[in-house]
Amino acid sequence: MSIFTSFLLLCVVTVVYAETLTEGVQNSCPVVTCSSPGLNGFPGKDGRDGAKGEKGEPGQGLRGLQGPPGKVGPTGPPGNPGLKGAVGPKGDRGDRAEFDTSEIDSEIAALRSELRALRNWVLFSLSEKVGKKYFVSSVKKMSLDRVKALCSEFQGSVATPRNAEENSAIQKVAKDIAYLGITDVRVEGSFEDLTGNRVRYTNWNDGEPNNTGDGEDCVVILGNGKWNDVPCSDSFLAICEFSD
């Protein structure tokens, strides 16, 4: 049997088998026939997206423009305190505050009056007065430097007689050997008061001043009112004078 004869038989069998199937089934598929291939159909619908692939490498093109700023995020926590800044420039001077001092001034004046009265009472009871001067004695013995400091502390000065009357008052107050505010520290033999003025009244004891040992630069008053020169470091009573 030739190839062509076999092909014809196959076609006949196919047709008979197809008719048999169409008798029992309505609306069935068309019978397969031996014919040339038909035209391609339309493309089918897109399939489902596949799984996400791995991130690719950056492209080789130019970088695009920066996009617009995003929304403002939430406020962050407070930061640590910063370093202390430099001191600013000095400000303008402010206006003077108004304050009524009349009451305070009145109280100060009253206090001064009471202190003056108390001072006068002390001076009258414990001192000798000559003119406008009061002479007050200390019960302690000390060097001339300490006598000066003591009298200055009470706004007075070391007693310095300017005449016989003042010398007599100092003698009565002292009742013992006491320093006078007279020295020849600057020039030996030239006696001055503690302000640098040369003294004009003197009442030296016999043979005085003698500067025994080349170190007697200060002056004391004795119990009889006479004067001696002595070393300034020796300790004697302090007599202070105050002006009324």
Swiss-Prot record:
* Glycosylated sites: 210
* Gene name of the encoded protein: Mbl2
Biased composition of type Basic and acidic residues is found at 45-57, 90-99
Complex and partners: Oligomeric complex of 3 or more homotrimers. Interacts with MASP1 and MASP2. Interacts with MEP1A and MEP1B and may inhibit their catalytic activity.
Record note on domains: The coiled-coil domain mediates trimerization.
Q: Which GO terms fall under biological process for this protein?
A: antiviral innate immune response; cell surface pattern recognition receptor signaling pathway; complement activation, classical pathway; complement activation, lectin pathway; defense response to Gram-positive bacterium; killing by host of symbiont cells; negative regulation of viral process; positive regulation of complement activation
**Keywords, ordered alphabetically:** Calcium, Coiled coil, Collagen, Complement activation lectin pathway, Complement pathway, Disulfide bond, Glycoprotein, Hydroxylation, Immunity, Innate immunity, Lectin, Mannose-binding, Repeat, Secreted, Signal
Domain Collagen-like: from-to ranges: 38-96
- Record keyword Cell wall biogenesis/degradation present: no
Under which name does UniProt file this protein? Mannose-binding protein C
Q: How is it modified after translation?
A: Hydroxylation on proline residues within the sequence motif, GXPG, is most likely to be 4-hydroxy as this fits the requirement for 4-hydroxylation in vertebrates.
Which species expresses this protein natively? Answer: Mus musculus
